[in-house]
C-alpha cells in the first residue's frame, strides 16, 4: 500500500490518465480479495478501516429495517464493535451480548434463543483477534438465514488463514 500513500495518491474515479491507472490497480485488488473469499468483485467494497466496515454493516442493517431495533453480538468482539454497540444502545437499540464458553467458543443454542422478531442483525467475528478461537460461522449464518435475520461477520483475522467461502456460509455481509 505504501506506493499509494506516497506517489500513486490520485483519485481512481477521476477521468485523467493517472486516475485511470489507479482504477486498474483498484480493480485488480478487488479481484484478488474476491478470489480469496469466493465472492464476486462487485461485492467487494473498500473502506478506510475495519471499524468503518463493521459500523457500516450495523448501520445498513438498522437503516434498511427501521422496525427492527435489536442486535445480537458476542461479549468478545473487537473493542470497536463493542463500543459501537454501546452507542447504539444509547440511541434506542437493544443489544444482546452473547457470552462465550470457558474455551472461548459460542453456544449456538444461546444464539438461537437470543434472536427475536425485531432482531435486525447478528454480528460475530470469524476468528477472535486475541485468542485465535474460530467461531462456527457456517452454523451461525445458517441459523440466522432460517430465522430471516441478517448475519455479519468480521473475518479480517481469518482471511488468508482459514478457507472463507462467502457463497457457502450464507453470510449477509
Question: Where are the model-predicted features located?
Answer:
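Pyridoxal 5′-phosphate
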Residues: 1-173
